[in-house]
């Protein structure tokens, strides 16, 4: 997950010794984003793939236990997540005297049988189907990891099936330090309203509903450009997002990396969290979601939302300023460092910076 790398880099720039590891890097990831890569796909003869991967992974894990004070992982596991040793991973970490911080990122924390009957949950089940046995295994793993973790950091929507949450932050990761804020929209311009929508999962993102809404607005004479960004690198995606006035994240659920990239670029961001859905209430009560300037929309309302923005360019520049202020306060590198600094302090570690190691 790129989020793990951006969080790790933020901690390192703040003076922590932090390293990130991945066992799968997608083609759209930035080269060199992760400090260590243990690829699952290495091809070896004579059926040696599995034992070779297990040996490399176990070796890295053992070295880490001698170096780190804090061990970050997901609900799918950490370094040993794709090995038969995953069930004992956090127990070994605790035996080594290392504190564990677990964060959800997505399907790792979803138990399909226990999800609410909502459009986003139905979309996830269609895109990432599971058998009942697979779902039961995920449920058991979540319960086991939550019980053994020293600290669980929440993440919007992904707390739906978690047995415990110690920190109700909306998102725990920053988008990276290399994103620059763009200019404010000119309210007097006759240029088209430019919309960008990075989409890696059309069904989950509501992409087809967005396209249909923009087509209907075109029929009404609206001068709107829609850029559907798919199948490109993160660098190219961000370049195209930077040209837009409005970033559409997703129309069915929460908000995530695309949204905070848009906030960092000083864009108007539209996403699909339902302010009345009970799942979001803890993030209003215990976190900062009530301050969020992101415009909410669903597949049913996106046309009206875009038409309102099209007809009032003045409001766009106001929201742009609010977006960047919100980003700096809650989703910047500094916000990430403050978040995990507080977590480490609650775990009793107050002298990590500059002399100890935190491995993400």
What residue ranges belong to the model's regions?
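N-terminal subdomain of nucleotide-sugar transferases
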Residues: 1-36, 143, 149
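Membrane-proximal helix-turn-helix segments that form the acceptor-binding/catalytic region
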Residues: 62-65, 88-95, 99, 119-151
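Active-site proximal beta-strand in glycosyltransferases
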Residues: 70-72, 90-127, 170-171
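A short, active-site helix/loop in glycosyltransferases that binds the activated sugar's phosphate group
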Residues: 111-112, 129-170, 212
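Conserved donor-binding/catalytic core segment of Leloir-type glycosyltransferases
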Residues: 170-205, 211
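Catalytic binding pocket for nucleotide-activated donors in carbohydrate/polymer assembly enzymes
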Residues: 246, 251-252, 257-313, 317
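A charged, aromatic-enriched C-terminal amphipathic alpha-helix characteristic of glycosyltransferases
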Residues: 311-345
